């Protein structure tokens, strides 16, 4: 999926109902955030955190409330999604510790190195493997030596039987989340067309090639897997 397509998908209509749409499967997000917080919990009290593809800001909000001394930079190309993120931060009284950058990582002005970066369900939209490696390299360039990357993406073993079985469970879960059959069918088509759903070892190799040590997988919830790695 190219940049224009991504911005068309995550438009004003999407942003206004995004959090509500996924509220029924919030336990997946909550488990991810709980473990992300554990991975990063030893950072300094005034750590700087880069949130790449911040969307409506769920991980930023969670981490900012859990770690009241941390400072955040949210990078998000969709203006409507970033507006929701900013509004939520203002409502919770944490906006003073946040910067909001509309655009991509390469357009973020140079600044102090970050202690950690999050990229949750972002790199999966980069279908070209070289571009995906470059995405992680861009994050590594913003981190201090030894800084953490926490990354989550849709990922699955690609043996036909295992993948189809897990995929079936995934869509049945979406039905329980009250998505309409039409919405689920659109999701199926998008996964086939617009998501680079790769085996976990391949995703780990791409992260390493982007300037990180060997990633450690710390979570799997259905098709979502998450890793942490450190900049080398």
Question: What positions do the PLM features span?
Answer:
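A short beta-strand submotif of the Rossmann-like class I SAM-dependent methyltransferase core
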Residues: 119-123
